[in-house]
UniProtKB/Swiss-Prot annotation:
Residues 242-263 are annotated as: Disordered. Residues 249-261 have a biased composition (Basic and acidic residues). This is Norsolorinic acid reductase B. Induction: Expression is positively regulated by the dothistromin-specific transcription factor aflR. NADP(+) binds at residues 75, 184-185, 210, 239-249, 311-319. Keywords: NADP, Oxidoreductase. It holds the Pfam family Aldo_ket_red. The record marks 107 as: Lowers pKa of active site Tyr. InterPro entries: AKR_Detox_Biosynth, NADP_OxRdtase_dom, NADP_OxRdtase_dom_sf. Belongs to the aldo/keto reductase family. Aldo/keto reductase 2 subfamily. PANTHER family: NADH-SPECIFIC METHYLGLYOXAL REDUCTASE-RELATED, NADP-DEPENDENT OXIDOREDUCTASE DOMAIN-CONTAINING PROTEIN-RELATED. The gene is norB. Pathway: Mycotoxin biosynthesis.
């Protein structure tokens, strides 16, 4: 057996040799990715007034560290930093000669030529076939590659038909320019309709959804997560750290005083209240508050790959450490008790909490439907659970 293992290359690097173990992207996508996805929105200087400053040297050091820890999943978009983000990621992959090791995601839909004011802008954005064609061609050039692992539509424009969208995306897959399809910032009903159209016509389906989700902004849980579970899709949430709004009490006071970095993001009461619970749990575990915030989304449901990004190397170093933070069910419940999340109708109708004055909760499966319970006691198969931190 030992000789057989040697014959199959047992001296090759295994998952245990790296800091991060890999996971399958989705039930419908067998590509293997690191549990964290490195977001490259901050890589560039064109929009530093909005996002804060990040030099090319710093961006390369962040990507080098992420790669050294086993990170192979990188997310960018056609319009980030007026195209500099894609350019820098492409230059980094070229200089490190590691393109085929990286699972590279980019997006189209946002107008990416806005910085060239002399051009007619109208078809450089949106979901149309033309916008898709010119954007992908430009992205391939900037990224210095001949294929994109995951192409997202960046947001739904409410004007492109499902047939036009899915046939155009499928053409990119058939041509070899794109391997997998993703969708971002789009209503759940649109994604379900698009995937059903793709199934009915033998086309490639969306396999991953990207959207905003964190412990103080849980709308993702209302329809997006159930839809992805049913469609066999992965989840790539952004804003998992509250866009910097999850702060310790001391950090929050200091930030209000200095106001550095990005100039937007929620500062509402839910973030303050959730931060208090995150800080309490972090102190008890000897971890950073951001570690607990990341652990929350990682351990809520399977196939979750948080997009983590920052302008400083220490940001991503801290994010990798969060993979070893385990939360109990009681700790998750404590976080969720910090502010009332109402899943709304029909979810609270199905759970029965719409009528009984109890805390509003959503029915997550057949065992939660109160009218079914009236018919008798039923033992249901449990839904798949998230992967726990290694060693837990």
């Amino acid at each position: 057996m030992a000789s057989l293992r040697r014959g199959f290359g047992s001296d090759q690097t295994t998952a245990s040799d790296t800091k991060m173990h890999y996971r399958q992207l989705a039930p419908t996508a067998s590509v293997r990715v690191s549990p964290l996805c490195l977001g490259a929105m901050n890589f560039g200087e064109a929009h530093k007034a909005r996002y804060g400053e990040c030099s090319k040297e710093t961006a390369f050091s962040i990507m080098d560290y992420f790669y050294s820890q086993g990170g192979n999943f990188i997310d960018t978009a056609n319009g980030y930093q007026a195209g500099e983000s894609e350019q820098w990621v492409g230059e980094w992959m070229k200089s490190r000669d590691n393109r085929d090791e990286i699972v590279l995601a980019t997006k189209y839909s946002t107008g990416y030529m806005n910085h060239e004011k002399d051009k007619i802008q109208i078809n450089y954005g949106g979901n149309s076939a033309k916008s898709m064609k010119v954007s992908v061609a430009a992205s391939l050039k900037k990224l210095q590659t001949n294929y994109i692992d995951i192409l997202y539509i960046h947001w739904w424009d409410y004007s492109t038909s499902i047939p036009e969208l899915m046939h155009s995306l499928n053409d990119l897959v058939v041509s070899g320019q794109v391997l997998y399809l993703g969708v971002s910032d789009t209503p759940a009903w649109v994604v379900s309709k698009a995937n059903q159209y793709a199934r009915d016509h033998g086309l490639r389906q969306f396999v991953i959804y990207q959207g905003m989700w964190n412990a103080a902004m849980r709308d993702f849980e209302r329809d997006i997560i159930p839809m992805c579970r049913d469609e066999g899709m992965g989840l790539a949430p952004y804003g998992t750290l509250g866009q910097g709004s999850f702060q310790t009490e001391e950090g929050r006071k200091q930030r209000e005083k200095d106001n550095p970095g990005r100039k937007f993001g929620a500062k509402s009461l839910p973030y303050v209240e959730v931060s208090k619970v995150l800080e309490k749990l972090a102190n008890a575990k000897g971890k950073a508050i951001t570690d607990v915030a990341l652990a929350y989304v990682l351990q809520k449901t399977p196939y979750v790959f948080p997009i983590v990004g920052g302008r400083k190397l220490e940001h991503i170093q801290g994010n990798v450490a969060a993979l070893q933070v385990a939360l109990s069910e009681a700790e998750v419940e404590e976080i969720e008790a910090a502010y009332p999340f109402d899943a709304g109708f029909p979810h609270t109708f199905l759970s029965g909490t719409l009528f009984d004055g109890a805390k509003p909760t959503a029915a997550q499966g057949p065992g939660d439907v109160f009218l079914t319970k009236w018919q008798g006691d039923i033992d249901w198969v449990e839904a798949p659970k998230a992967i726990r931190p290694s060693g837990q």
